Amino acid sequence: MEEALEARPRRWIDSLTSLRIEHYVPKLRKNRIREQRIHNEVIVDAYGPEEQALGWYYYLENKIQFPFSARCMAAKVVSPLRKGETVDVRSLAPEDSCAHDMLVLIRWHGRNVAVPLSQLTATDADESTVEAIGDWHYWLAQGSCF
């Protein structure tokens, strides 16, 4: 068992021991416009992880027009979706559910299910929605988290 763990990348082991949620999104090149928008509209007055989460929640709530269609970009352990599945996104999950990740509610097999926004890309949405989701993906890709 120890040999198997030693073969794993160190970052993976560190994330397990600290119980930190890791987002495996490819790192994007710096985007000055996006950086300024995120700073000025999302985290400008945030003095800690809880306030950053609230900043993101209200930013996304104001910018995203629900409902919209989205496709799953990658499967995640915490979500029932498989890569390539298309879903209708109905709303943000309740605020208290988004303290560690931004979750959205979808209708899936006759049930309302919360899934990470980070695993979805909008396929039929307005410009504001696409931009807001892109900002969230960008922030995660830069290695940021709450």
Model-derived segments and spans:
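A short macromolecule-binding patch
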Residues: 111-120
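Residue-level recognition of beta-strand microenvironments
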Residues: 90-92
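Long, low-complexity intrinsically disordered regions
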Residues: 29-34, 129-146
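Lipid interaction determinants
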Residues: 5, 121-122, 128-131
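Short aromatic-glycine-enriched beta-strand elements
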Residues: 96-105
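Mixed-charge, Lys/Arg-rich low-complexity intrinsically disordered regions
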Residues: 12, 16-78
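Short strand-coil-strand connectors
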Residues: 73-75, 107-111
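Short coil-to-beta-strand transition motifs
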Residues: 77-88
